[in-house]
Amino acid sequence: MAIEFGSRKENFDNFKVYETTLAGRPFKVEMGKMCGLSNASALIRYGETCVMCNVVMSPKPREGVDFFPLNVEYEEKLYAAGRIPGSFMRREGRPGERAILTSRVVDRPMRPLFPKEMRNDVCITMTVMSLDPDCSPEIAGMIGASLVTAVSEIPWNGPIGGVQVGLVDGEIVLNPTQEQRKKSDLALTVAATMDKIVMIEAGANEVDEDTMLNAIKAAHVEIKKIITFINGIVAERGKPKIDFQVVGLDMDVFHAIKEKYLDDFKAAMDTDDKNVRDAALLPIMDKIAEEYPDLTEADLDLVSYKMQKYVVRRWLLDEGKRVDGRGINEIRPLAAEVGILPRVHGSGMFTRGQTQVLTTCTLGGTKDNQLMDDLTDEQTKRYIHHYNFPPYSVGEARAPRSPGRREIGHGNLAERALIPVLPDQAEFPYTIRCVSEVLSSNGSTSQASICGSTLALMDAGVPIKAPVAGISCGLITEGDRWMTMLDIQGVEDFHGDMDFKVGGTRKGITAIQMDIKIDGLTYDIIAEAFEKCRKGRLYILDEIIKPVIAEPRHELSRWAPKMFSMMIPTDKIKDVIGKGGKVIQDICATCNCKIDVQEDGHVFVSAVDQEDAKRAIFTIRTIVEDPEIGAIYKGKVTRLMNFGAFVEIAPGKEGLVHISKLDTKRVERVEDVVAVGDAIVVKVTDIDQQGRINLSRRDAILALEAKKAQQEQG
């Protein structure tokens, strides 16, 4: 059977490379060769970082949903960094924390620019295929996601661009290199359109508001250049945007409902109690459902959403009135408490209105550090913050689920807010884990987690450099009109246009996370939000946290492990560990402790009982230090001979106690005084030229008795 081969070869006639620079480094876009079945795709090359970006839209809208089903996935392949996954299957598993956080960072600026009425599934995928540590794959992925969506036929009001900003020696640096990031006081990511800022994410070492705003402005200048580059590609190969099927509520029906029931909604919502408000809305919705039987469950949910949104926004814009009656710059009632849970190492509870978070702090040894298996160069993490949002916190009767993207994002925000004030590892070598349990949620739980973490850390005796507090600022816009309000609650977050979260100390900002539902913010709005959050943060620090616990406790909890550190010569590490780990395992078992020996000779010993840790330190010292003549040791009898007993004073170090030096009185037989396995005190009397150690139990007993007598006399 003959096999015929076609003479035609794929020439990729539509393939083209577009080139520019981003923050001084080459930036290339390859289109027309790969992923031909996506709506649009591009391979982004930033330095030697390569990210494959794709966007796909379903041909038909998804039925039965009242939201736009957008899915943004950032994938890290370990082959990009020349590594094999450490899992049993040696295959990448579920997305790691860094990948989830990057997916959120790309999702948040892109989502507001899609039509809210669209119900077609849209999936944006960014796959890191090669990693250059000096060229951020997150920024390459964000720009690539923006580019492919803008080029595709999918309706979208982009493009956007993104830039990272560092602050090195007081100078603003765009897209800092790996070495610059290590020295930077700022890790800021900004996304923007040509005119407005659409996303801000930051961790900072107490940076002031003016410097932060200048960094955002510097980022925007570079972003405008990349947007101009994207627009040139869109002009050349962009596809016409398709019309989509609008799935939603009949607006004539909605206007009729609004005219009839507006006063009822206003009366129901005029309360500061979320439960009362929700209960008052139920009979109104029952009446509407009875009057309009053709409305589906999704339609009724949309009616409720639109009516509440209309009331909240009109009250704010027309009357300056908030749902709970507060002033625009007024914070809800606050409370703080520490030492709530007796057996945990530290605990703190922070309450803001109907939002309440209980945070615990647990201390562990260096071996409790979290192992990282992603593309980052950081292999372990010593400070961990976890955020849990159980259903009961919002009054829902359902089983709890494992943490999702929201929980991971909120936990990371609180984690970044506290990292700048943690003590150096040399000063405080513990692993620190904070867990924030949301007990009740009515907005700003992530900021309550920051405050709760400060309380728990100080209650645990962690010597933080300064207390940290967090607060959020909201926004309502209508055309050119806008209004910001401090400390937004749930209904204002849900129906407002912005949730601007800022954590920091008295000195400056340590973390920012900005979410918006509109097409962007002006510098004036950002500056006002910064100032309101600064004043609110100082109030919480001075009036709420300081009176409860002004500084970290001077002693750790009695239940916390006690940790000691020491340095040993690197050539002695093998002696401490022993063959197959036998020596170190014996020390851990005997002293009931944990020991971590690092490559540079640092040894960390932790134990709940301080005396156990000290015994382990002493044992390690006896191993690495040569025995001193005149020093007294506690050793174990290993062998009995006619002429004496051999005693191990440290692993691998054995000496002889001659029968004449076994006791203060004459000894006829060695076994009359000691047996194999006995623990006895001995004194080093001599070390000969061959390194053999001579010991005396008699001299040790006499020396200890003399010391005791001296103490009794003195």
Name each region found by the language model.
Residues 38-122, 128-130, 135, 201, ...:
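Glycine-rich, flexible beta-strand/loop modules in the N-terminal catalytic cores of phosphate-handling
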Residues 108-116, 151, 340, 365, ...:
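Conserved helix-loop functional segments at active or binding sites
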Residues 40-43, 135-153, 338-361, 442-462, ...:
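Conserved phosphate/anionic-ligand binding catalytic regions in large, soluble enzymes, centered on
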Residues 2-58, 242-377, 561-575, 583, ...:
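Extended amphipathic alpha-helical scaffolds
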Residues 2-245:
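Long, basic N-terminal domains or extensions that often function
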Residues 153-268, 457-554:
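Mobile "lid/hinge" segments at catalytic clefts and subdomain interfaces of large enzymes
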Residues 559-565, 570-714:
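Single-stranded RNA-binding regions, centering on S1/OB-family and related RNA-binding modules
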Residues 116-122, 157-159, 226-244, 275-276, ...:
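Flexible, glycine/charged-enriched surface loops at secondary-structure junctions
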